[in-house]
Regions:
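Catalytic phosphate-handling regions of large nucleic-acid enzymes and associated NTPases
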Residues: 1-168
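C-terminal interaction appendages of subunits in large macromolecular complexes
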Residues: 107-316
Length: 316
């Protein structure tokens, strides 16, 4: 995708039609399933991807389930993140674990997105101290960080087990604001956009039972009723307010799909990166290679690092 968009647009910074970019992506990657490629494009929307590499122009749908427009009527171009890695600093793209910061979802794995600053700080820690404990790593990586913000409630021991084994479930909660007869729900759990909020909440039943009104915005869902407490009790178990999301750090290890912990993922990434830099810069000592890699990380962090959007609440 990164290489296809500028090839079709011909000039850096110009937008091109998604249909043309999709065809070029299929050609460069030898991928013949256009629907799957289009889904990969839609994964780069700002409310789905934590650090998208492209920017769209057109009707992209909404997080509450509104369908996107046709690819014929949507344009796409590289954003600052994508231009930095493709044009300004091509060597930097391999220096960060893209699947960890943006997440990766498939039949075999479910990696949730993480904060760029935290991942880079954990990489620097393991670079300088390879025998660092998982507790030290989790002192830096607080947990997943979603693009729309939300709240994660989890036990400290459960969080430790998830990142040690690479598998588990986390509970994600929306932000609910009650003001008199008005209830505003925002910062939803992830994957609501797959089906739409209508599939999780009976709007017609709400109007009849509570004699209320609803208003659906881009990111906020407003409910007007004279019985807000009864409404919240009925919605207590709704996926709109609370949802359990699985985590599976599945990777191919010696030709087998295995679930691995966060420390092994980061350590293997560092080892592979050191080998690549050693080949690229022959004659440099291991310490010089490490210094070059850390400088790349610091540059990426200072350019694109941001604050955590998801709140982590540790419960007993």
């Amino acid at each position: 995708m990164l290489r296809a968009i500028p090839r079709v647009a011909n000039l850096e910074g110009y937008a091109t039609g998604c249909k043309n970019a999709l065809k070029e992506t299929m050609y460069l990657s030898n991928w013949y399933d256009g629907g799957a490629v289009w889904n990969e494009f839609l994964m780069q929307r700002s409310f789905v991807s934590r650090y998208p590499v492209v920017k769209f122009q057109g009707c992209l749908g909404g997080y509450l389930g509104d369908a996107p427009g046709s690819m014929y009527f949507i344009e796409v171009k590289l954003n600052e993140f994508g231009e930095f890695f493709l044009f300004k600093h091509p060597a930097a793209f391999i220096t960060i674990p893209y699947s960890l910061i943006n997440g990766h979802y498939s039949h075999y794995t479910n990696i949730l997105p993480h904060n760029l600053n935290e991942i880079i700080d954990a990489l620097i820690l393991l670079m300088n101290k390879p025998n660092a404990s998982l507790d030290e790593i989790l002192g830096i990586i607080k947990g997943p960080d979603f693009p729309f913000g939300c709240e994660i409630r989890i036990n400290k021991e459960e969080l430790y087990q998830i990142y040690m084994s690479g598998q588990g479930d986390i509970e994600i909660l929306s932000h609910v604001l009650t003001n008199g007869s008005s209830v505003s729900i925002s910062h939803y759990p992830p994957f609501i956009e797959e089906f739409g909020i209508d599939d999780y909440f009976d709007l017609k039943g709400f109007e009849q039972e509570f004699n209320g009104k609803f208003e659906k915005g881009d990111t906020v869902f407003h409910l007007q009723t004279n019985e807000p407490e009864a409404l919240m009790k009925k919605m207590a178990d709704s996926p709109i307010l609370k949802r359990k999301v699985p985590i599976d750090f599945n990777f191919i290890v010696k030709r087998e799909v295995k679930c691995v912990g966060i420390k092994r993922i980061l350590s293997c990434f560092i080892s592979n990166l050191q080998q690549q830099y050693a080949k690229r810069y022959e004659g440099c000592s291991p310490s010089e290679v490490n210094d070059m890699i850390i400088k790349e990380w610091e540059k990426i962090k200072s350019t694109f690092g941001d604050e955590r959007r998801t709140t982590i609440t540790i419960v007993k």
